Regions:
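Bacterial N-terminal signal peptides
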Residues: 4-15
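Histidine-/acidic- and/or cysteine-rich, low-complexity loops and terminal segments associated
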Residues: 2-5, 21
C-alpha cells in the first residue's frame, strides 16, 4: 500500500512541472487594452488574456490614475498561452497587425504616454524575437514611417479592474462603437490592407 501511495505521489508531482511548462506569458501594449484582448482570445493556444498596467512608478495603480497620464504606466494586455500550441513569434505577428507601430503619441484616438505601443519582454528569448520582428517590419518598407514601438524589459504587471476584463464580451455594443469612433479599424485597414481581427 505504501509503495502504491509513493508511486502515485511521484506520478502526480512529476506531472506538475510538465503542466507548468505548457504555460507562458507575453505582455503587449497597444493602446486601449479593451481592443487588444479579442485578437489574442481567438487564437488556438491562447489560454487567457488580462487587461492591466505595466511600466510605471506607482504600485497598484487605478484606471483613473493611469489615464491621467502621470504614473508612467502603459495600458497593456498579458497573454497566457501554451507554447506547444502557439509560438511567441505568432503572438508578435498578431500584435503588429492590431496596432499602429508608427504613431509615437499613442494609438488611434487615444493619445498620451499610457497609450503608446510597446512589447514587454519577459526574458532574453522574447527580447531577441521582438527585436528581430521589429527590425524585419521596419526593413519591409510596408509602413508609412519608422516603427516607434519600443521593446522593453517587463516590469510588474498589475491587472486592471474587473469591469475592464473581457469588456468586448460584456459590452459588445459599446465596444464596437468605441472601435469605430476611435478610427481603429479604418487605420488598421489603411496600414495593413486587410480588415483587423476584432
Amino acid at each position: 500500500m505504501k509503495i502504491r501511495l509513493v508511486l502515485l505521489l511521484v506520478l502526480v508531482l512529476g506531472a506538475l512541472p510538465a503542466a507548468a511548462q505548457n504555460r507562458a506569458l507575453a505582455i503587449f501594449a497597444g493602446g486601449c487594452f479593451w481592443c487588444m484582448e479579442p485578437p489574442f482570445d481567438k487564437l488556438d493556444g491562447v489560454l487567457s488574456t488580462t487587461s492591466g498596467y505595466i511600466g510605471g512608478t506607482m504600485a497598484d495603480p487605478t484606471y483613473e490614475q493611469v489615464t491621467a497620464g502621470r504614473t508612467g504606466h502603459y495600458e497593456a494586455v498579458q497573454i497566457e498561452y501554451d507554447p506547444a500550441r502557439i509560438g511567441y513569434d505568432r503572438l508578435l505577428e498578431v500584435f503588429w497587425r492590431n496596432i499602429d507601430p508608427v504613431d509615437p503619441t499613442g494609438q488611434f484616438c487615444d493619445k498620451g504616454p499610457q497609450y503608446r505601443s510597446a512589447i514587454f519582454a519577459l526574458d532574453e528569448e522574447q527580447r531577441k524575437l521582438a527585436e528581430a520582428s521589429k527590425a524585419a517590419l521596419d526593413k519591409s518598407g510596408k509602413l508609412p514611417g519608422k516603427v516607434v514601438t519600443e521593446v522593453l524589459s517587463a516590469a510588474k504587471f498589475y491587472a486592471a479592474e474587473d469591469y475592464h476584463q473581457d469588456y468586448y464580451r460584456k459590452n459588445p455594443g459599446r465596444y464596437t462603437f468605441y472601435r469605430w469612433n476611435c478610427g481603429r479599424d479604418s487605420r488598421l485597414q489603411q496600414l495593413w490592407g486587410v480588415p483587423p481581427s476584432r
